[in-house]
Amino acid sequence: YIENAVDTTQLGGYSANFKRFTKYIKKGKKGYAKSAYSAYRERSLGLGAMGFHAYLQSRGIPFEGVFATGFNYKAFKHIKNKATSATKRLAEIRGECPDLYGNDRRNANLLAVAPNASSGIICSGTSPSIEPYRANAYTHKTLSGSYQVKNKFLEKVFKNKGLKVKELEDIWKDISGKDGSVQHLVILTDEEKEIF
């Protein structure tokens, strides 16, 4: 089940992003001289993951369950191993970063807990970073206005139960009135409540 969870064929490869990163370091503007120098010395990256909770909910896995813990460990160990392999290969090709000379690494830092909630919204409303969704329904305020956000995985569960449009509207209002919680809903099983 967890073995085939993520397509990892593209992880760890050398890409145009590394070339672009090097180009920006070399062309650092005068106002950024110290930052450019620091970046050149350590060549830190911030590889992270997003959509962790969305992934779990899409597969019907509770965030605090044993499957989530196992997948979390396995997925992030895989990311770390691929990032470490890639930085070592880059050190062979392009040389080590000056701050880590003798360690066979091109980059001092590889991983970061990122991105944030704004990135999650931009990426089709996925969950931010490795964090859980803050609620199943809430009002999102932006410069262009406010709109209600509904958990798309929970909405799918409701639709599979064959609810009518009016029933769905009432349920979403009820969820919004309970700060996005579904723990009070009798239509959901205990297992579904654990997921959402």
Question: What is the meaning of each model-derived region?
Answer:
Residues 1-196:
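Long, C-terminal-biased catalytic regions of enzyme "large/alpha" subunits
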